[in-house]
């Protein structure tokens, strides 16, 4: 896979915007490669610069710094060859989809299946955590109740004081479960 052609290479991309005498660093030193046939995702929190990165790559913004290479050719702002290459890539994609619509449907089905599996796994993990929390809470309440009963026994009856040690041990064991 490392021998695959690099379609898009982004090196130290910077996109700054001037705002009332100061600079907003929307994108700062972002680098990545996208190889032919590779599925690439740019993910992050809201407002972290994903859209700005994309817009900078397709030249909706003149980049502040860094380099962008498309099929090995360095792209400069507004370069006609780059715009033609992007246009051709879009046409190639549309032609590929038109020639094989089943592939697009199959890919969507696979993506939906993967998302459903991940959602199910997350729900199961949350359910397990909730059950674990409930069990821990129940054990802690039982342990505290036994400790309270042991204290009452110690205060009221010297014979019951012998039970205090064993219930304290049980209380400690229940309050700190092994999981």
Model-derived segments and their meaning:
Residues 1-179:
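ABC transporter nucleotide-binding domains
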């Amino acid at each position: 896979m490392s021998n695959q052609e690099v379609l898009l290479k982004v090196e130290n991309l910077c996109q700054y915007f001037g705002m009332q005498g100061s600079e907003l660093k929307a994108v700062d030193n972002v680098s990545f490669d996208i190889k032919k046939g590779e599925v690439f995702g740019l993910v992050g929190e809201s407002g972290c610069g994903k859209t700005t990165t994309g817009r900078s790559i397709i030249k909706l913004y003149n980049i502040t710094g860094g380099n962008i290479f498309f099929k090995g050719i360095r792209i400069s702002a507004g370069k006609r060859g780059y715009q033609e290459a992007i246009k051709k890539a879009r046409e190639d994609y549309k032609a590929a989809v038109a020639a094989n619509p089943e592939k697009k449907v199959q890919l969507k089905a696979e993506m939906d299946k993967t998302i459903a599996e991940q959602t199910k796994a997350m729900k199961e993990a949350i359910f397990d955590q909730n059950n674990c929390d409930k069990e821990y809470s129940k054990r802690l309440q039982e342990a505290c109740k036994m400790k309270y009963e042991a204290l009452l026994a110690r205060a009221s009856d010297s014979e019951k004081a012998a039970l205090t040690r064993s219930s304290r041990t049980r209380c400690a064991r229940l309050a700190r479960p092994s999981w």
